[in-house]
């Protein structure tokens, strides 16, 4: 409630949800299948489509939800089909083996979510670092999306996300920070780390592609590209104004860059919180740097 209230106060476009987790975590963090269903249902009724707010059914990930809780998540999705679904998928190899041991009757990690009706449009899966070929195909077939979280994947040593494969399979991708599991909430630094992840795989991430992932690509992965993601007339005015020369090093590199793509590359590799000059939410100024 507190998160939704804070977002509502500034009329933010936000998708959020209560984490569902009834096993394999500290006792003080656990709920139950029944309590998670009822608490989520109350939040959906109170906040989903309240102003610009939207709700995501959020099992933390398959290992921390019992089959009974997964069934409750499925029930919520069936009762509220216009909600979103968000969870983790194939982040690291030990996690994948763990899922297979907990759900031996399922054909892999993604199949757990799929059999509980938790794939499809408006279903966003974080990480997806170690997907099997059949899982890539299923994400594509169901029109599910991926949140690419480079700072988290690098910090935890999870592996390297294969963006080229996602494009080949026509799977939508947006940028993510994995909340606090990465090393920054700043999108410029997230793009900087994404560049390194892809460079290690021989894939050169251009500045245009990077900023697409952080804007319209993210909007498309959320199914909100009719509302946000660029400056087309009629869209909601959520944007930041950035200063490309916020530090002496940025100034030096910027002054020696000729093309727009080079200037954007400087911003995405050297920029950070200091680059954010103003933030607008639905056309209203909500932050201005001193």
Question: Which residues does each predicted region cover?
Answer:
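Metal-coordinating catalytic core of metallo-dependent amide/deamination hydrolases
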Residues: 2-128
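Short, acidic/turn-prone active-site loops that include or flank metal/cofactor-
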Residues: 19-22, 150-154, 179-181
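Catalytic core of soluble alpha/beta enzymes
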Residues: 91-123, 128-144, 154-167, 182-185, ...
